[in-house]
């Protein structure tokens, strides 16, 4: 049925017909800026209620009992979805891997932290075919343990137990992933079809922030790039994709080989026998998808993807067979019963067991992407080392698996449970524990006085604090003011942070810090991380006074300063903004598939802000000249925390037009005289153009809103300054 047909039926009785769906606003105006992404995962969609505290529930969990039940499940094969080789280990490893494997380092989104594999689109991605069965196998255990284990934690814990049940020693497990209750609307790519690859440009350049090679895949195409069975070309895709998942070459080899030590793939027949995915299935299927009419549709007849591959002679036990087979045999291209490209060992004896017939054996088989670990020269060197040193392989896989499954959990302070490893790992963005007495209210007042008596302006104080704190990403809980990594590479050199100004501000603040700490008895200190935030607060308070408003910005000390040794500079490079509308900054060369105003909403979502919070922050930061002050400073009183940005933006006496030769820049002129008044960007003008954002702007432009504007700005500012203070939760 076309959209027009649906509209024509709108006035008819819905009882005897399919219920009509009228055009949504997005249907009418598909290019309209979507700010609703800032209002998802609210209390209104959470059945647990505001008082529910998952950390408290998890602490009540009998983890040993839960793991015993999971161990028992591994070999409790069910007729409706039988276990390969009598053991569900391979299936559950794939489930956990694919839950975590959507993570991408560029924006920190994806990953296992919210249990999103339960929802569309992930639950229906082609690469997640039949993982709905894995989650259904887990339901009786989830039902038994209830609120004490989230789905997000259970998916990862089950992967760990699967490994342990097959003889592998894992590195550890941390709970603390809180479930969400609605799908995340993320940008997974520009494609409108499964397995499309419009995300590439030039010489196979993958657009940011994407990590997977095709729509609906977790990583790479196992048959090779776009199904081309070329192991060397596939290595290029593997390296790029895994790097965008924050994995280096050694971790990549360990993960592929370790995961493919267990289980098998499923390509028993032509994919045309497979039915709809879970989201597209019939109501009587109850959320189970990919129903197959090939043979029995399950077990030996299962079709999940295309290849039909078993890598190891002991697919339910940890071994080094993957590397032994990879190097001991030569490989010839073949096809699976489903018609997919795969490789079989030349002149090899049948030594690999059949998953369902104990009397049958098969020759070893591999995927194109497996052979990449031998035929790419860098991967080959690592693979041979693992072949010759199985203990190094086991350790590398254990560590890489832990990183894969915990990468998006943020700092270690968020980890829960008795299996949290004691070792600090650099990718955890380690921050030292507080080792000194913290400043009190009198100290704070004295420090603010010294800061305001220094040579630093309100603009410099506010900009530096915002630069430090606004790196926070609610997606993977990275960044933020804690650690004061703004003084370290690479952040100190980012264009958006105005390096020359930043160096000058930090030099002054470090002097104030030294003087204060040297004057204290008993070990009382203030960290630079705390002082940067406190200085920003002092600047905001001074700006409020200049606008006729007295207010104290809340401040809680306890941040610490990270060292260079605790900072992976290459990893932190991913936090550099492609755009930050709060500072009117755009790096157009990196801003793909997004307009600047869309990037603003994207940044606001990473900061966990609502649309009103985003609005008031932009208005306040503009008049304080934070960031890039060339455009959008709609005030004659800069560095005073007024509502002038909104008042002047909504003034009908101003007429806006694009500036010739400056894409995305507009000039506002007096509607009668033509005299120039202001210049602004798309990010500035969206608050007058977009009907919902204009409604928020009107609230703050009202004559009676001056006090509310300052209070709301301070509340949103404090939220950003404390966004990474998980120790306060």
From Swiss-Prot:
Active site residues per record: 98 (proton acceptor)
InterPro entries in alphabetical order: Catalase_peroxidase, Haem_peroxidase, Haem_peroxidase_sf, Peroxidases_AS, Peroxidases_heam-ligand_BS
Catalyzed reactions per annotation: H2O2 + AH2 = A + 2 H2O; 2 H2O2 = O2 + 2 H2O
Enzyme Commission number: 1.11.1.21
Cross-link for Tryptophyl-tyrosyl-methioninium (Tyr-Met) (with W-97), residue positions: 219-245
Amino-acid positions noted as binding heme b in the UniProt annotation, renumbered to this chain: 260
GO function terms (MF aspect): catalase activity; heme binding; metal ion binding
Post-translational modification: Formation of the three residue Trp-Tyr-Met cross-link is important for the catalase, but not the peroxidase activity of the enzyme.
Coiled coil: none
Region (Disordered): 1-26
Function: Bifunctional enzyme with both catalase and broad-spectrum peroxidase activity.
Subunit structure: Homodimer or homotetramer.
Full protein name: Catalase-peroxidase
Organism encoding this protein: Sinorhizobium medicae (strain WSM419) (Ensifer medicae)
Top-level taxonomy: Bacteria, Pseudomonadati, Pseudomonadota, Alphaproteobacteria, Hyphomicrobiales
Gene for this chain: katG
């Amino acid at each position: 049925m076309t959209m027009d047909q649906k509209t024509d039926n709108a006035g008819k009785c819905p009882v005897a017909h399919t219920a009509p769906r009228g055009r949504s606003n997005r249907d009418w105006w598909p290019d309209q800026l979507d700010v609703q992404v800032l209002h998802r995962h609210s209390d209104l969609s959470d059945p647990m209620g505001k008082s529910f505290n998952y950390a408290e529930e998890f602490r009540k969990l009998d983890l040993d009992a839960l793991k015993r039940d999971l161990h028992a499940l591994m070999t409790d094969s069910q007729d409706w979805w039988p276990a390969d080789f009598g053991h569900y280990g391979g299936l559950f490893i794939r489930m956990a891997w694919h839950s975590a494997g959507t993570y991408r380092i560029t924006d920190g989104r994806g990953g296992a932290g919210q249990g999103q594999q339960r929802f569309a689109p992930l639950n229906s991605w082609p690469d997640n075919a039949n993982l709905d069965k894995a989650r259904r196998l887990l339901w009786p255990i989830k039902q038994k343990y209830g609120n004490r284990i989230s789905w997000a934690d259970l998916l990862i814990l089950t992967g760990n137990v699967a490994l342990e049940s097959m003889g592998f020693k894992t590195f550890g497990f941390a709970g603390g992933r809180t479930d969400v209750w609605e799908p995340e609307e993320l940008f997974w790519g520009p494609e409108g079809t499964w397995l499309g690859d419009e995300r590439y440009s030039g010489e196979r350049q993958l657009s940011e922030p994407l990590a997977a090679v095709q729509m609906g895949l977790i990583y790479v195409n196992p048959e090779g790039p776009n199904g081309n069975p070329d192991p060397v070309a596939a290595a290029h895709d593997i390296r790029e994709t895994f790097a965008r998942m924050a994995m280096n070459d050694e971790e990549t080899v360990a993960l592929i080989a370790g995961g493919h030590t267990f289980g098998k793939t499923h390509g028993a027949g032509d994919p045309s026998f497979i039915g709809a995915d879970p989201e597209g299935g019939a109501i009587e299927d109850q959320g189970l998808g990919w129903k197959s009419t090939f043979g029995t549709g399950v077990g030996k007849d299962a079709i999940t993807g295309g290849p039909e591959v078993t890598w190891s002679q002991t697919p339910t036990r940890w071994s080094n067979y993957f590397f032994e087979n990879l190097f001991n045999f030569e490989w010839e291209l073949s096809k699976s019963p489903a018609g997919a490209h795969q490789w079989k060992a030349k002149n090899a004896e049948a030594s690999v067991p059949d998953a369902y017939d104990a009397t049958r054996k098969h020759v070893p088989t591999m995927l194109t992407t497996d052979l990449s670990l031998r035929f790419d020269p860098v991967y080959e060197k690592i693979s041979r080392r693992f072949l010759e040193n199985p203990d190094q392989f086991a350790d590398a896989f254990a560590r890489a698996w832990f990183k894969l499954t915990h990468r998006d959990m943020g700092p270690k302070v968020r980890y829960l449970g008795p299996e949290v490893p004691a070792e600090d790992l650099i990718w955890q963005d380690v921050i030292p524990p507080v080792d000194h007495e913290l400043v009190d209210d009198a100290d704070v007042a004295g420090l603010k006085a010294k800061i305001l008596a220094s040579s630093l302006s309100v603009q410099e104080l506010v900009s530096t604090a915002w630069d430090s704190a606004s790196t926070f990403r609610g997606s993977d809980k990275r960044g933020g003011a804690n650690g004061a990594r703004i003084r370290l590479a690479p952040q100190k050199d980012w264009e958006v942070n105005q390096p020359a100004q930043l160096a000058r501000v930090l030099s002054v603040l470090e002097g104030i810090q030294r003087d204060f700490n040297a004057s204290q008895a008993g070990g009382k200190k203030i960290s630079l991380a705390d002082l940067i935030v406190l200085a920003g607060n002092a600047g905001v308070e001074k700006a409020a006074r200049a606008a006729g408003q007295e207010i104290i910005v809340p401040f809680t000390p306890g941040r610490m300063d990270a060292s260079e040794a605790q900072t992976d500079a290459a990893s932190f490079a991913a936090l550099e903004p492609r755009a930050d509308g709060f500072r009117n900054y755009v790096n157009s060369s990196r801003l793909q598939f997004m307009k600047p105003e869309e990037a603003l909403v994207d940044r606001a979502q990473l900061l966990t802000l609502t649309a009103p919070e985003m609005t008031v922050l932009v208005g306040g930061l503009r008049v304080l000249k934070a960031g890039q002050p060339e455009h959008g400073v709609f005030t004659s009183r800069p560095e005073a925390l007024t509502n002038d940005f909104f008042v002047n933006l909504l003034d009908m006496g101003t007429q806006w037009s694009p500036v010739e030769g400056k894409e995305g820049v507009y000039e506002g002129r007096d509607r009668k005289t033509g005299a120039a008044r202001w210049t602004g960007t798309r990010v500035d003008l969206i608050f007058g153009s977009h009907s919902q954002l204009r409604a928020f702007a009107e609230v703050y432009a009202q004559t009676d809103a001056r006090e509310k504007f300052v209070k709301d700005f301070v509340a949103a500012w404090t939220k950003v300054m404390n966004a990474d203070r998980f120790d306060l939760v």
